Amino acid sequence: MAEQNQRTNTPDNGSEFAIQRLYIKDLSFEAPRSPQVFLEEWQPELNMDLATKVNDLGEDNHEVVLTVTVTVTMKESHIFLAEVQQGGIFTIKNFPKEEMRPMLGSFCPNILYPYAREAITDMVVRGGFPQLYLAPVNFDALFEQHEQSEEGNSGTEDRVH
């Protein structure tokens, strides 16, 4: 069985993808209007922003950091801000160059998002607010959109999506 798993992770061309480590790089929660906000009727407006940063660590290792920022307002008043930078170190070997950008810009953030979402929802509940449901994100579509907007610009390994 272990042999079979190893073969599925390393195709005939010797390509390899491995998660080395997942970690929280930064975590922040601000609720400037608590406790007064708890006495008001709960009618929030939620805004979520996403950003991805990729750092080449050498020797086929890459750090991918997904930043998820959730801002909740009510009647134009800032209720809370929750932000997490969920990081991961990924080993990516022997993939064609044209596959590297989608792996780092879409595939890796897809792996990181559930962890970031869990950290955000946990912070919000611990802050005394109702649990948030953050919908799944189509990182493939976001990556395509980013690539189209960056067309013509020369890319670097360190970039923000």
Curated annotation (Swiss-Prot):
Stored InterPro entries: SecB (IPR003708), SecB-like_sf (IPR035958)
Molecular function, one GO term: unfolded protein binding
Subcellular location: Cytoplasm
Record keywords, A-Z: Chaperone, Cytoplasm, Protein transport, Translocation, Transport
GO cellular component: cytoplasm
Record carries keyword Flavoprotein: no
Main location: cytoplasm
Role noted for this protein: One of the proteins required for the normal export of preproteins out of the cell cytoplasm. It is a molecular chaperone that binds to a subset of precursor proteins, maintaining them in a translocation-competent state. It also specifically binds to its receptor SecA.
Family per record: Belongs to the SecB family.
Assembly behavior: Homotetramer, a dimer of dimers. One homotetramer interacts with 1 SecA dimer.
Annotated protein name in UniProt: Protein-export protein SecB
Taxonomic source organism: Coxiella burnetii (strain CbuG_Q212) (Coxiella burnetii (strain Q212))
